[in-house]
Amino acid sequence: MKNFKYILLTTIFTFIGISCEQEMTELSPFPSEGYSSPSGSSGSANFAKFATIGGSYTAGMMDGALHNFGQGHSVAKLIANQLAYAGGASTFYQPDINSANGYIGPGPDGIPGTSDDQGRTYLTQSASTGAIGIDFAPGDLMSVLTPYGGDKTALNNFAFPNSVLAMYLTPFAGGPNVPANPAYNPFFARFDASGATVSPLGQFIGSGASFFMTWLGHSDFLGYAARGGDQAQVPIPDAATLGGYFQSALGGMLAANPVWKGVVGTVPDLLAAPYFQFIAATVAKPTEIIPMANDATLAQLQGLAAGFNALNTSLAGLGYITAQEAGMRTLSWSVGANSILVEDETLTDLGPLWDALVGLGLLDAGTRAALDPFKMARQAFDGEILPLSAQVVIGVPVHPSMPTAVYGVTVPLPDQYFLTGAELYEFEVARQTYNAAVAGAVAAYGGGRVAIADFNGYFESLAGTSPFTNNNVVVTYDFAPPTGMWSTDGIHPNARGYALVANKFIAAINDKFGASVPSAMVGSYTGAALPVTVN
């Protein structure tokens, strides 16, 4: 994979000052784009009515939230725009969110619906220092809680974010909103036309469409990886279960409507998104991160490492841990960049062993206390992943009164901020297994009516060719303005990126059905927005 890892947020934007003269002093409406006016044909397909179902990409989530601009440039909407040139309808109804900023969650007060609620993210640039940052626009909780005001029975796009595949198969996705109903999704409930009696998939099937796009399972994998593989928050996707769900969904769709045709998508190589590639595993600089740090601090860390490593060697010699694990846990600090200290739940918990050594008089209590943060710790290996969310934790003291106890250096990052090599392997096996189930379902039930847009390796291929041009416009695989194809959350594309994704689906449609649907003109869509100037 092309190396597009970056250490600090400022690194990716060093060119802003020389390539972008524009300054923004407040949040402004996004510009509109012009669309091409080509012509095409539908081949053996019928695009008269197009319906879609899927997760956050299909719904148009962008900058961490579902908002007007993102929804207006969803993958579903951009495909519909192009189908209109090949016999498709000129209208495509989505459950308008009616919010410029959308809603991510409560702000620092932790209370939803208050003045510090957080909406979409955007880039900022300090007027005094030029430093680049990311901030939140004011959140709009009511955009999620307010029912869609249009005709719910006329919708074309049944996609909704913050979902898992099982939600699409149950009417309980529409309610009730009670703790005993984990299937409830407020983004679906606001446009549920059935009063929680028909599943999202059932309503999608009942739309009477002649052509469909289905992208299911994507969000299950995205949610797990985004939370660092912390199974206490999101379990690793069970590929066998998800594959069964998809087979049931596709079989039901095709049986219920024996004439419609469509396209399905596989789960992309999500770990190639900037959210998972932005922070290098070797960013810890103790003498810069720890306040008042100096050569003496580094010497203390090196002394701690020497003692820790020697202790592990002894434990391996006594058979309490393997020599391989002792090697994995070797700590090393030096001047400059060092590997991040992380928590690895697969390691042996050394706490009880150290307690036993204290009881035997072989380890003093002070040393035991100093070692406690390292009982399941090691330093990250090359190729392991720190999600972008770790940026706000690395180098932060555990408590203000403990300035030298900082995450990533002297205290391991919690599991939610790190994907181990084992977790990455499990993730990829599950993703590939699920994608094989998608292909198997199409082979078993498709009957020549279903195309597959295979996104395996797609993001990595874009990263490997970045920068590239479209319509004489430069496109880069990042969220750096003005050329980037990713939104500021690093995990959802922006309008330009969604156009690239839409074109992948369009290519599959053309290939399967002998159609000539024109591709979206990627260069005509907005890339990453310029930063807002702040004091």
How would you label these PLM feature ranges?
Residues 50, 75, 79, 210, ...:
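Histidine-centered active-site loop/cap adjacent to the catalytic His
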Residues 66-248, 271, 276, 282, ...:
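Conserved SGNH/GDSL esterase-like catalytic core that processes O-acyl groups on lipids
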Residues 14-46, 515-535:
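Bacterial Sec-dependent N-terminal signal peptides
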Residues 1-18:
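Sec-dependent bacterial lipoprotein signal peptides
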Residues 205-207, 245-264, 430-454:
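A structural motif corresponding to the C-terminal end of an alpha-helix
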Residues 48-64:
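Catalytic nucleophile-elbow at a beta strand-turn-alpha helix junction centered on a G-D-S/GDSL motif
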Residues 56-59, 217-223, 268-272, 457-460, ...:
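Solvent-exposed loop/turn segments at secondary-structure junctions
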Residues 273-449, 453-483, 496:
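Acidic, Ser/Thr/Gly/Pro-rich low-complexity segments that form flexible
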